[in-house]
Structures are given as C-alpha cells and as structure tokens.
Amino acid sequence: MSKTKGVFLFAKNNGQLDYVKQAVFLAKRIKKYLNVPVSLATDSPIYLQETYGTDDFDKVINLDYTNNSNLRYFYDGAMSKKQGGFKNANRADVYDLSPYDETLLLDTDYIISNDLLSSVFESNADFMIYKKSSDISQARNEDEFEKIDDVSIDFYWATVVFFRKSETNKTFFDLVKHIEQEWHHYRRTYQVKSHLFRNDFAFSIAIHIMNGFQPGSFAEELPGTMFYTADRDILWEMNDDKMMFLVGKENYLGEYTAVQTKGLTVHVMNKFSLTRIIDKELANE
C-alpha cells in the first residue's frame, strides 16, 4: 500500500493579519509547483468557508478558538509597525493532526516558487528541517539565525519541516510539546534572552536533546537553502515565480534597495506587504 503524502498548514487569525487568506494563496501555489494535496488546521473554519471556500484543501481541521497569544510587533517595512497577537502555540500537534504518512509542514508566509521541496517525498530521511539560511539582501548580519542565542545551540527553522510518521518522530513532537509547556525552564537552561516562545527555538532545543545533547544526525537538511526577507523589507511585486522586494538598507532607516528573484522560494516575514500582494493576485483570478 502506497504511503499518503501532503502539505500541512496552520492558520490562526489575530485581528491584524489574515493567515487564512495566506493559507488559501499558498495552497494554490503548492498545487501548482509541488502537485500534492494540502490540509489546513484553522480556528476560523466558518470564515474560511464563507470567504474563500474549501476547494483548495484536501482536508480542513477545526481548531478550538482561543485568545491566548504572544503579543509582539509586526513590521510593515522599516517605518511602520503594529502590535498584535502571535498565535504560534501547538505547532507540534501537526504529528497527530496530519492525515498523511509523509508530511511537509509549512508556514503560510513561505512562498513556494519552484518544485525543489517535492524531492523530500522521495528522500530516505524521516525528518528534515532547514539549518542553512540566507537573507536575500546578501548584505546584512545573519548571526541571529546561527544560534538560538550567542553562546547556545544551533538554530533550526520551524518554518519548513518534513517528517514521516514513526515512533521516533512521535517522540520528537511530544518533546516539542513538553518544551512549549515548560518554556521558561528551557529558556533559562538554553540561555535564550527572549521571553517570547518561538517554535524555531523549541524545535532547535528538541533536536539537540534527540541528538543526545551533542551534534548528531537526527535532523537532516532540507534541499537547497532557506531564503528569507526581514519584516523591515517590503514585497513590492509578484508575477508567477518572479518577486520584487524592497530590501531595507542596513544603517539607513527608510531607504531600500530593489531585489528581484525568479524561481526562488522565499520566507516573507513582512506579512502586511504579503497580504497586499495576495489581494492583487486573488482579485486577478
């Protein structure tokens, strides 16, 4: 019997940002470039149904609505920011929620523009995640994504995770849940300065523990490199697999350099500019 495979997304709206809209847009690109089914877990299923419908998804899983969130600032370029809730809890529930034997977990602001990640389903690796990353500006300090803190362990991105259902991987995701529940203990143990819970940190700590508290081979590298733009940058234009970014100049607040990508999948951290582009794209369908 062949194994089932697909992409899994979470979408929890926070009053400032429409993650459901992001998920709908990303699902369309996943079907186009990766050609695999997409499942969505959301706390806004009625909004999804009434606004966009569910045709873009293989399965929609209803999550309980909660106001629990981490407050943080969301930037829209260098000169604008808004405070909102960051509903990033329970990402590790993907192991139990996913209907697939082989799952590619993605953030909704990870804009697929090629078929590179389709190769993970043919890989022999049971757990894959990005450690290698690159700022598309190629000109800014990237140290914050090397370690979870200056003198702590290696940083891994929870933005993209591939896993197969197995007892070992169940142990990993149960461990991430435990780290989330006891975050303040693990934050102090691993010398993380920020009080804000981040899945990147929790996944990094869990990988360190799974490796026996030393460098190891539990997590294998996803294909390619995790490219990203900061929330101080602006996604300005999109045309199929081409994107134009205004990348903030370091030490020159409010000044930008235009950077164009083609066929490059990018983690777009400025979700406001992403939303403006999505509105244009969906209006043109």
Regions found by a protein language model. Give the residues of each.
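Active-site-proximal specificity loops/subdomain of glycosyltransferases
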Residues: 47-98
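Short, polar loop motifs at secondary-structure junctions
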Residues: 42-48, 65, 112-114
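Short, acidic, metal-binding catalytic loop of nucleotide-sugar glycosyltransferases
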Residues: 26-36
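Glycine-rich phosphate-binding "P-loop"
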Residues: 4-18, 67-78
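Residues at the starts of beta-strands that form the adenosine-phosphate
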Residues: 36-38, 102
